[in-house]
Structure formats: C-alpha cells, structure tokens
Amino acid sequence: TIQGIAGKAVKEMAYHIRHAGEWVIRLGDGTEESARRMADAAEALSIYVGELFEEGAAEDVAALPRRADLRATWEATISEVFAEAGMTFEPSKYPQSGGRDGRHGEQLGHMLAEMQSVHRAHPGATW
C-alpha cells in the first residue's frame, strides 16, 4: 500500500540522515586532513543544493509537499550537523539547475552505475 511504502521511506530517510550526519561530524571534527576533505566535498556538492528544491511535475500532486516548502527544514538540519562538526555549509552562489528537466552531465551515468551495482550483483535481494 502507499501508506506502507511511505512508512518505510520515512524510516529509510531517518536512517540515512543520521548515518550521513554522523560521518560529517566524525570527519569535520576529526583530523586537519579529514576536515579539509569534508569541507572540499561540501563545497563541490553545494552547487546541487538548489536542484533539491526545484519544482517538477510531481509537485502538482496535492498529496506531496512542495519542495520549496522543505528547504528551511533541510537548511536547519544541515546547519546543525555542520555546526556540530565545527564547520559551516554555504550553498553555491552559482547553482546547477535543469536536472528535473532531464539536463544531466556525464557524471550521472557513473553515479547511477555505482548506486545500482549491488542490486545488479544480487537481483531480488532484500534487507
């Protein structure tokens, strides 16, 4: 059912938020090298923040929250995690856009292949 899928998705998101946050804190508040690398990674990914909140066709569905309405909560969560890591996160002044319209760079294919590798290696597996 939709309710069951949504319930599982909420649990999965909570897990991933917690897990990623713990790594940001661990690395940002770790050695000088780990903090530098975390800062570099955050800066490199900051150009994509705006795309998280761009409107798409799915936003026309009344049951879904508008992406733009989620931004303040996202920013508060990110700010809290980065502050705990002794860092700050600033979205890029020159954001990427167009992903929801199908405009993607070459890197997307590589990322999708990596994310799908376990599923392809073990079809039908569940956890």
Model-derived regions: residue spans:
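A contiguous pocket-lining binding segment that forms or flanks enzyme active sites
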Residues: 3-62
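Extended, helix-rich structural scaffolds rather than catalytic motifs
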Residues: 36-127
